[in-house]
Amino acid sequence: MKIIVSEEIESVCPTFVGACVEANVVNTPYCQELWDEINALGEKYKQTLNTESLKEMSGIAATRKVYRACGKDPSRYRPASEALIRRMLQGKELYQRDTLVDLVNLASIAYGYSIGGFDADKFEGDTLTLGVGKANEPYEGIGRGMINIEGLPVYRDKTGGVGTPTSDNERTKMSIDTTHLVVLINGYDGDEQHVRENAEYIIQLLKKYCQSDGGSYFIYK
């Protein structure tokens, strides 16, 4: 897997650093131990954060700043990490999907980065390019139908968009049958050490909950 960061992104976020985790996995419908971790973190955040202070988490604040620089309102199109933590703080249940989706959500909540999880066998070609969404660019968000990604950072494969910090694409989404996983961590705050820690955390979660050796990761800028 090769990942290119376009000049469009470099111009609005010259310090961007990303990580790509790739692993062979076994997905399951539900994992109680994983949800125990998710719920424990939710309780911790309820003691330490509110819906305003969470916007100051480094990864979230930087992603919101990039949205504005690209012309997108981050209060209307919230980064997924912010939306997930906000839901927890409001006392709402997180949506339970399957172990891979739930695991990626936990990794995003724990570090504040918007993280995309993909079935790598559904990508077209072997290269992803991170750019900015165009006017009228077709994009079907998972469970959201067609969404307007103009001004959103977007990863594209040979066919089109596969992931934004707000919503990943139906075409390349993880499913219960996914065995070849790619996870992309978006460090718009430029904190390479924190991004690496997030990648290593994901590898540990995959070992614990997805019958995986954890795979490997690389940094891209």
Task: Indicate residue ranges for each PLM-predicted region.
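Charge-biased, low-complexity intrinsically disordered regions
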Residues: 1-221
